[in-house]
Amino acid sequence: MQLSVLIASVLAAGAAVDAASYTPQNVSCPDNANFIRNAADGLSPAEKEWLKKRDPITRDALQTFLRRAFANVSTEITSALFNDTENVPKLGIAVAGGGYRAMFVGAGAFAAMDNRTDGANEHGLGGLLQAATYMAGLSGGNWLTGTLAYNNFTSVQQILEEGDKADAIWNITNSFLNPYDKDFSKTLARWTAIGSQVQGKRDAGFNVTITDLWSRALAYGWFPTLPNAGAGLTWSSLRDNEIFMNGEMPMPISVADGRYPGTTVINLNATVFEMTPFEIGSWDPSLNAFSDIKYLGTQVTDGKPETERCINGFDDASFIMGTSSSLFNEFTMSNDSAVAYTYLNTLSSTLVKGIDKENNDIAMYAPNPFKGSKYVDSNYTTSIVDSDSLFLVDGGEDLQGIPFVPLLKQERDLDIIFAIDVDTETSDNYPAGGPMMKTYERQFSKQGKGMAFPYVPDMTTFVNLGLGGKPSFYGCDANNLTDLEYIPPLIVYIPNSYHSFESNVSTFKLNYNYSERVGMIRNAFEATTRNNLTEDADYVTCVGCAIIRRKQQSLNLTLPDICDKCFTNYCWNGTIDNTPTKLLTPNNQDPAAISSAIAAVTDDSPIGALLNTGSGTKSNSSSKTNSTLVTSSRATSTGTLISNSSSNSTVSSTAARSSTSSTAKKNAGSVLKLEFSKSASVMVAIAAAAVASLI
């Protein structure tokens, strides 16, 4: 009886939530509106105008960085480059996917490149973020870039300084599934609010799916200080943000994969979509078009509105960020994950009336902004532009786990890409270069038209040569790349690796306490900087050599002598080693692990106990909610990213793997099971409560 009263009161309060905040709105169409353009025309006029403001700022920031990099080197090359604006190198940053692991590892790399971070200029690569023109992210990497961009380009340093405040960005001590731990009424109120927000969009006539709920739930960790966690904050609104308008931050690019109508499989032939504050679309021949992202949701034919009324607000920032990490379709492709999908489908249908059931596993963009487009390459099917809806999924489902594609376009004229890889390809959940290999392969496919990527090793060679233990460079000599469609950017590859904190955590870990967040970020700072430059005092200089390499070769300038040493130490020289290795074996993070975890729902959580939803095996009551895949004795509760004694935390990634691999595998199953058992109890309780309210 008491529980029924509590549920009724919370649901009544939830009804007052401003559902309109997430609901797209009708507006008047611009005069002579045509929202689609041919990708063959190059960059959009809006992006070109923005570059006029961004380029002078990146030029100054890069010059400052290179002066520091070559402070002890006698060279005139920087003067030669900066005397002509056309000769100034341009750089981009790409952050891989991998859930919260990717977000925090990417955050550590960004902190190392940000001159606002304490110690980044003295012990890291401070200033590179300020010198970057673009920052691309997919899935968890996009959670990072989106969080920073849409919080007024805040810094990782500033986020950490907020500590564990209730409204601190990235405070996920409790997972988004059970945000208030033992406070049932607040958790129920949160999910009621989310359901109300998504219901408003559905009631306005727009299709909604699991991705809408996913996006809104995650947003409370990205935009905690905004009303309703930023519901109504649009991706295109960055155009009107003074920091972005004035070119004072890199342009964020969100990456997602397109799914062909009537199919379920995503592979290298998938259409890669990019979303900037100006446009959504793809350079791939299967679409070859872009549309104004501000007017998503408008009924169009070949870009022209069918009525005088257009739509604004469909491009909710959280929805764009959630789209890039929408991987629920993978649950439908395996019998092992049927339990997980059934559970999620039931939950979403409970929270939102009229949710799309046929395509509930993807992000649905309907009406299709590219309906009737005439720009598809003649050698490709027109199924994407024939469909009434556009279907998008996690940007890493085609196995291109690093969002290289938008940064490789010749039109963007980049000389170098800093790639942060957070994949889990080895037996101990560390990267093995797979995303680079897939992007390399893609350039030779039909979808690779107009694309080039430098030669990279296979994954076995990558592991055998120890390339996962430190940063490495690819495409160092343009003279060896002349067989490609054009000379691609040089790649500085920065893999997630162990230094002071075991960062090989499961993608399905949904909560991190403050010390874990700091540990992940600090470890990535060290991985990005060769352990605060203690492993190689010349590393900043070597990064400088990599940055100027493309322009140096094209202009036939003389490199500083030290660059030869740098390229010997960091450039992959083409060596292949296919000796079989046990380290390169599948990890345990497959759909079956999710299903077994969800199937093991217990009544250990307070909400589960209240509703008597216990089932499966009871988890140990002494277990802590803030568990982690592998624990670190060196974890710290302070937000300082520079260790007091760097030498004490210097451990090679290879050595760390051999010592932690067995621990990781031993703990993976039990911890994943614990996390999902608690979360599933909460969500079953919420679903049950919502159902009860409708009876």
UniProtKB/Swiss-Prot annotation:
Q: Name one GO cellular component term.
A: extracellular region
Enzyme class (EC, first level):
hydrolase
Give the signal peptide range. Answer: 1-19
* Intracellular or extracellular location(s): Secreted; Secreted, Cell wall
A single Pfam family, by name?
PLA2_B
**Record field: catalytic activity:** a 1-acyl-sn-glycero-3-phosphocholine + H2O = sn-glycerol 3-phosphocholine + a fatty acid + H(+)
Q: Which SMART domains match?
A: PLAc
Which residues does the record list as glycosylated?
26, 72, 83, 115, 152, 171, 207, 269, 335, 379, 480, 504, 513, 532, 556, 573, 620, 626, 644, 648
Q: Give the PLA2c domain ranges.
A: 28-577
> EC number(s) in its UniProt entry?
3.1.1.5
Q: What is its main location?
A: secreted
The protein's superkingdom reads Eukaryota
Q: What are the GO MF terms of this UniProt record?
A: lysophospholipase activity; phospholipase A2 activity
Q: Which PANTHER family match?
A: CYTOSOLIC PHOSPHOLIPASE A2, LYSOPHOSPHOLIPASE 1-RELATED
Family per similarity comment: Belongs to the lysophospholipase family.
Q: What is this protein called?
A: Lysophospholipase 2
What organism, scientifically named, is this protein from?
Candida glabrata (strain ATCC 2001 / BCRC 20586 / JCM 3761 / NBRC 0622 / NRRL Y-65 / CBS 138)
What is the gene name? PLB2
